[in-house]
């Protein structure tokens, strides 16, 4: 029971993360970060007020999401209980489900921000999530203390929780015994404070959690968040980090200060690794030591987030050589779906070769490292990523539109294109001609002009008419294009910078408008055929897409390398 009840805090943590937007104009507000120890291994802080219009829309969006989570939880629990693999674990986690159900019951029917505020919750609030050692803590602004207190009482009663009440000075708090650690909840006039504290260090760490005692050195004093904002172009609307290298050291028993103190109080033994394997783990995480994330733009048109897996200069140098420019990948797009990939395979081979050799050398004293197996993989890399594949750079697939038959749900019309970036596209066609007489007889100019692909190439009868063209180092295949010409080729200006390794762009609103009703019809058909579980999954997916499409019109994700490491940008265009 204690192990499962510890997940209560994860619920509160999730609520804090959904409220990761802000009230005050400062970037990293001292009143939040002054409570955070400078040596925390992780943090996410929301410290700057969003534009009012965006903030209001997000608040209603979050409320609508929370309002349907109880029904979603019931479905998940039912599915887990029906699974032979996890049914026993689901029964053991019954207390967790009771608490979560009790909490989510409070949100049912409250589909607006104003309705949530009636519970004392501010849907879009300044907040900070951090670690007192490795144990999580949360501080979040609230709408009404008395109403939130009443909510916590109802949840505890409905879930059958045993809650001890006490106070430190004039600050009241709830304490829930979870075994070796306790969950602490404190509602002040302006904040909800929550965290896990060890039994052994409870009296020592409680003032720190409640904000009555400052850490030896705070994250506000260190300036680390401000430096991170400047380094990665964040805005202060929300940013944070996870220090992978520090966490590895803590778990290996090499932490210091508060981190070591908490581990000792937990009675946690260091991870059982030999000296050699421990050194290898530290070496590997030192190469890419920190994950950072933050908001780079937020206005009435877009919300843009960035995640960076920071690396050493040596690793960044390898990463920087991987991307191959593929026309159109990552460029602005307004159709249903675009997905593309561009990788220099010889450079990928070099990077993997260097990684394997590093593992062999650094892991010589680690029994987990299969030296012979790794050495055998090196020549295999040269075969798989050798001269035969060196000319393959990547692709860009665009699905502009798909019309489905409402009765059979099969495609009636398709408008799409597939661009393959290849050093020798004509050589690829020649290779295909060896297996297809029809393709061998086809004359394809090298100037980018399109020709029709004959239907006798072994394609299925339902395949739409296809056209193919070759230009420079690219082959372009079109489907559903009656007239094709130079405008169907991606423009040079359409190639994104920096060069993406991967990109995906999809129109949420377009997908819902095109396929939402058809998907619901498909779910109805599945139910009539007895496929209840599949029908429910499809219905839930469509409902999720519809909810997202009420706020977001498009989403785009790109992955690229920089001098900082591996960077993922996500652009969410608002309706």
Where are the regions a protein language model picked out?
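Bacterial N-terminal signal peptides
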Residues: 8-18
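Single conserved position on a long alpha-helix in the C-terminal lobe of the eukaryotic protein kinase
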Residues: 43-44, 94-230, 390-501, 570-574
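Membrane-proximal interfacial segments on either side of biological membranes
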Residues: 345-351, 427-430, 511-521
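Long, C-terminal catalytic modules of enzymes
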Residues: 249, 259, 264-267, 271, ...
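Bacterial N-terminal signal peptides that target proteins for export
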Residues: 1-9
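Broad, structure-driven detector of short, well-ordered beta-strand segments within folded domains
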Residues: 182-187, 279-282, 286-297, 390-402, ...
